[in-house]
A protein has these predicted regions:
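Boundary at the C-terminal end of the N-terminal hydrophobic targeting segment
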Residues: 2-6
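A short, Trp-centered hydrophobic/proline-enriched beta-strand micro-motif
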Residues: 11-32
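Short, solvent-exposed coil/turn segments at beta-strand boundaries
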Residues: 14, 40-46, 61-65, 107-109, ...
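Residues that act as N-cap/strand-start positions at coil-to-secondary-structure junctions
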Residues: 31-35, 43, 53-55, 98, ...
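Short, surface-exposed charged micro-motifs
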Residues: 36-38, 56-58, 103, 120-124
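An acidic-aromatic
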Residues: 40-87, 138-143
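Flexible, surface-exposed loop/linker segments and immediately adjacent secondary-structure boundaries
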Residues: 73-112, 117
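Gly/Pro-enriched, hydrophobic low-complexity segments
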Residues: 105-150
Length: 150
């Protein structure tokens, strides 16, 4: 089992090709929405996130920001890094979990929380191949992402 409070364990986990399922609570119609995809970190530390369902999208993440390809509408959108300065998920994915002063609180042997930019993230290693992350996004929507090593 990966050590819950280990930044190295998180960074090592995210250096693998990962499949994921993201579940969000839609408070408008009181339902759960799901998306799924694959996250791959390349040797140059850029990240490709391919959303498979419900919409076909590809996100390219690097030090310059995020490039979003909507494959169904054949559109590309670019978000510059300066617009993502307080986006914790971007920071975690792009920079890893080695940021100086990252506020990690161990809960038990397999779970911990991180507070960054007044946002709280709950991490739980289910086992060495599965990691769950729970958080509220910038629109106060509850998110659960289940990552699986391939």
């Amino acid at each position: 089992m990966a050590s819950a409070n280990s930044k190295e364990s998180l960074n090592a986990f995210f250096n693998n090709e990962l499949s994921f399922i993201q579940t969000t609570l839609n408070k408008i119609n009181d339902s759960f929405d799901e998306s799924s995809g694959v996250l791959t970190r390349k040797e140059d530390n850029t990240v490709k996130i391919e959303i498979i369902e419900p919409f076909k999208e590809i996100y390219f993440i690097n030090n310059d920001g995020i490039e979003i390809h909507d494959l169904e509408f054949n559109q590309i959108k670019i978000i510059n890094k300066t617009d993502l300065i307080n986006n914790s998920m971007y920071n975690f994915i792009n920079d890893g979990f080695s940021k100086e002063g990252l506020n990690i609180k161990e809960i038990d042997d397999s779970s911990f929380s991180i507070e960054e930019n007044n946002n709280f993230f709950y991490f739980e290693f289910i086992n060495e191949k599965v990691l769950h992350i729970k958080y509220k996004d910038n629109m106060n929507i509850d998110n659960l992402i289940k990552f699986y090593k391939k």
